[in-house]
Amino acid sequence: MRTDLNLPAQFGAVKDDDEQLLWVGKPNFTVFMLTGVPFLIIGLLWGAFDFFFATKMFSGDSNAPLFFAVPFLLLHSAPCWLGIANMVRLFLVHGNTFYAVTTKRLMLRSGFWGTDFKTVDYDKIADMEVNVGPVENSLCVGTIRAFSGNTTSKGGRIYDSFIGIQQPYEVFKKIKGISVDVKTDWNYPNAIRPETNPGYGTKYEKKAE
């Protein structure tokens, strides 16, 4: 596991002064790239259909004008180009992708030309799950997904994911434990709480391992 000492310097731009980083990880390259394979397969199948269509269009039996046929095929085969471009994007983004667990929130860092950050406060997390597929299991990694209420226009859930990280079950338990502690502090900030944790005004203390 990574610590503050080897944390990418760019995380300092969004970390609060009183915020501690408890875990930082990076996605496994193979698993990260595999996230783009479904879109790539669809694009290649679409491209294969367009290639077959193009061979018929440009054969001697066809009278289709080139000024119409070429732009049409280029536009129609967009899913193929987008699938390939997405794989290139994932390759370039991987080196700039890191995940962090802090005393206040989850942090996700990525970006190609620039650096993008996304944070998820613990009180917003409604559901979490950890997935370890066959490929991930063979690489000793897994993916943690957190749902914070965001949905698509059709009502599908939008997850924030820690993709292909090492020790996924340990990190999952760590996030769940911190989330329960922080939510309890926010929901019941009063002096009647145990002396070791009188309210959210206190600083979250990392338990000794």
Map each language-model feature to its residues.
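Short, charged cytosolic
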Residues: 1-25
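Alpha-helical transmembrane spans
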Residues: 30-96
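Envelope-exposed proteins and targeting segments
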Residues: 19, 97, 102-104, 124-126, ...
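A membrane-cytosol interface segment of integral membrane proteins
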Residues: 136-209
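Flexible glycine-/small-residue-rich
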Residues: 25-27, 103, 110, 124, ...
